[in-house]
UniProtKB/Swiss-Prot annotation:
Subcellular location: Host cytoplasm; Host nucleus
Record's subunit section: Interacts with host RACK1.
Function: Plays a major role in the shutoff of the host protein expression by cleaving mRNAs probably via an endonuclease activity. This host shutoff allows the virus to escape from the host antiviral response. Hijacks host RNA splicing machinery to selectively target host RNAs containing introns for destruction. This may explain the preferential degradation of RNAs that have undergone co- or post-transcriptional processing.
Annotated active site: E80, D108
Protein name as annotated: Protein PA-X
Family per similarity comment: Belongs to the influenza viruses PA-X family.
Origin superkingdom: Viruses
Important for efficient shutoff activity and nuclear localization (site feature) positions: K195, K198, K199
Organism name: Influenza A virus (strain A/wyoming/03/2003 H3N2)
Keyword field: Decay of host mRNAs by virus, Eukaryotic host gene expression shutoff by virus, Host cytoplasm, Host gene expression shutoff by virus, Host mRNA suppression by virus, Host nucleus, Host-virus interaction
Length: 252
């Protein structure tokens, strides 16, 4: 699973996931499923934010990369992917600026158009079950919840899906592709089932598999959201080195 994650995701997402697991004292060599889940969640959060801006009239618009209008205000503030101290600093700043109620738990995004925090969920189970778990944990009407599944289903607070259909379709397609690539490598069952995960862990401890075949339809392009986060945690030389090593696979 670890090899798959390093092949399938942008190296900057991988490093953010590594930093998050290290912050909580988790070993990605052992908890490989959690490593994959964190990377997936990070990518969905960044895709949620990508290309969405607010114009001078306060309207939400979608702008593709390299468009001259890209200097417009970003619609979403990305909180996920930052260390806890910085994340709470961002949340406090947003609350002080907008008057929003401070959430009890760290959310993933803030929507400047709708003036609300957003909690993003990516589940391997039924979306409604995961939604209820999130809602019971957060217990706040001021945090909007949006859940995606690997099967193309989604559920959001009051059926308000925030994004346009095309933007959500991009996320669903990416999740479905990740599922298919895991299935092709015999990783999906262990990703879904804890029992299968334990079997896979024992197998991995006995023999480390060489990475095989690169995943199809994986974007080499750096997410605009990652470009925003990048200066905060990675210098340009390190970024270049990571990009140069992206998707390299050891030869047999």
């Amino acid at each position: 699973m670890e090899d798959f994650v390093r092949q399938c995701f942008n190296p900057m997402i991988v490093e953010l996931a590594e930093k998050a697991m290290k912050e909580y004292g988790e070993d990605l060599k052992i908890e490989t499923n959690k490593f994959a889940a964190i990377c997936t969640h990070l990518e969905v959060c960044f895709m949620y934010s990508d290309f969405h801006f607010i114009n001078e009239q306060g309207e939400s618009i979608v702008v593709e990369l390299d468009d001259p209008n890209a200097l417009l205000k970003h619609r979403f503030e990305i909180i996920e992917g930052r260390d806890r101290t910085m994340a709470w600093t961002v949340v406090n700043s947003i609350c002080n600026t907008t008057g929003a109620e401070k959430p009890k738990f760290l959310p993933d995004l803030y929507d400047y158009k709708e003036n609300r925090f957003i909690e993003i969920g990516v589940t391997r189970r039924e979306v409604h079950i995961y939604y209820l778990e999130k809602a019971n944990k957060i217990k706040s009407e001021n945090t909007h919840i949006h859940i995606f599944s690997f099967t193309g289903e989604e559920m959001a607070t009051k059926a308000d899906y925030t994004l346009d259909e095309e933007s959500r379709a991009r996320i669903k397609t990416r999740l479905f592709t990740i599922r298919q690539e895991m299935a092709n490598r015999g990783l999906w069952d262990s990703f879904v089932s804890p029992k299968e995960a334990k079997k896979q862990l024992k197998k991995n401890l006995k023999s480390q598999e060489l990475c095989v075949g690169l995943p199809t339809k994986v974007s080499h392009r750096t997410s605009p959201a990652l470009r925003i986060l990048e200066p905060m945690w990675m210098d340009s030389n390190r970024t270049a080195a990571l990009r140069a090593s992206f998707l390299k696979c050891p030869k047999k």
